[in-house]
């Protein structure tokens, strides 16, 4: 038995394998070979990284900041100031690692990280004001909501929007890596995928939220409502003559103020504009612009766009007043 390569130790119902020295040597050699093989297959950009931000730390900082912004700091028995100080301590080294990973020197990365932290702290009151309008929108549009506290604590749409608004600020500051890491942490916990580059106005309500996708160049106005399964995506990708994807172009739709998009609807294309106060019915595919005050619903092998009578009356009134003003000007 003394010459066996492995032995079994028993502690109650728990069994643990014990590896003796000669087998440990073989294991280490095998792991070294695997490490060399893996490193040779990495893309050059990934091979040179020595420091990367931690996804766990970034997600933790985002969650803590959301607690401070939504007034949930009392859960941990901390003051809001203590919570924000803790977030700064967590975020600064992760931001520094992100800048280093994209080519900055340690000194420049640290200076950039501190600048971004100061910028975020200055922006937090504005972010919170917008977030409170999101909470109000959820309370006003969801009859199942019993209180704003319930919404702040339990609604996945609010959590996703809170993380997005923090990430969007970093994205505007051209922070590498961290904005996408923040929104992907929210995606993992809520099922709502919002790119940090998207633009979302105040008073947005994402109800239920599972499988909502909001692309990078999407623009959403104020007081819009999205239900589960909604996709605001790209219709196609423009490419160079060499076949590479063109980046930075408008690929995703624009929703004007007051638009409601029901479950599993898909709106595609950078030139697609949904006019203000329009409604997109469930499970509709929209790839063309829709005028204001319209209802888009599926028909037999077609999409039906119907405009409300009130919008027609308001347009006639505005048209008459415009013609009267033109007559007065002509005189």
Would you name each region that the model predicts?
Residues 187-309:
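Structural signal for interior beta-strand "rungs" in well-ordered beta-sheet cores
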Residues 1-184, 312-331:
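Terminal amphipathic alpha-helical/low-complexity segments used for targeting or macromolecular assembly
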């Amino acid at each position: 038995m003394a010459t066996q390569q492995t032995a079994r130790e028993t502690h109650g119902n728990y069994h643990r394998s014990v590896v003796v020295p000669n087998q440990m040597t073989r294991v280490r050699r095998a792991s070294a070979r695997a490490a060399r093989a893996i490193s040779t297959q990495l893309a050059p950009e990934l091979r040179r990284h020595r420091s990367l931000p931690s996804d766990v730390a970034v997600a933790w900082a985002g969650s803590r900041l959301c607690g401070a912004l939504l007034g949930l700091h009392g859960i941990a028995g901390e003051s809001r100031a203590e919570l924000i100080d803790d977030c700064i301590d967590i975020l600064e080294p992760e931001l520094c690692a992100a800048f280093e990973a994209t080519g900055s020197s340690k000194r420049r990365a640290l200076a950039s990280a501190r600048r971004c932290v100061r910028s975020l702290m200055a922006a937090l009151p504005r972010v919170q004001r917008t977030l409170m309008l999101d909470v109000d929108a959820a309370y006003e549009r969801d009859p199942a909501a019993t209180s704003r506290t319930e919404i702040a604590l339990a609604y996945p749409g609010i959590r996703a929007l809170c993380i997005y608004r923090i990430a969007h600020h970093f994205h505007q500051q051209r922070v590498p890596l961290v904005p996408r890491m923040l929104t992907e942490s929210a995606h993992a916990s809520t099922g709502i995928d919002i790119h940090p580059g998207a633009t979302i106005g105040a008073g947005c309500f994402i109800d239920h939220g599972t499988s909502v996708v909001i692309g990078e160049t999407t623009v959403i106005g104020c007081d819009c409502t999205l239900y589960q399964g909604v996709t605001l995506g790209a219709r196609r990708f423009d490419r160079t003559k060499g076949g590479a994807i063109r980046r930075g172009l408008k690929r995703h739709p624009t929703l004007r103020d007051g638009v409601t998009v029901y479950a599993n609807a898909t709106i595609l294309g950078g030139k697609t504009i949904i006019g203000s106060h329009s409604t997109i019915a469930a499970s509709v595919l929209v790839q063309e612009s829709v005028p204001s005050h319209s209802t888009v619903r599926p028909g037999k092998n077609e999409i039906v766009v119907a405009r409300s009578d009130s919008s027609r009356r308001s347009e006639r009134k505005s048209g008459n007043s415009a013609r009267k003003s033109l007559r007065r000007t002509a005189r």
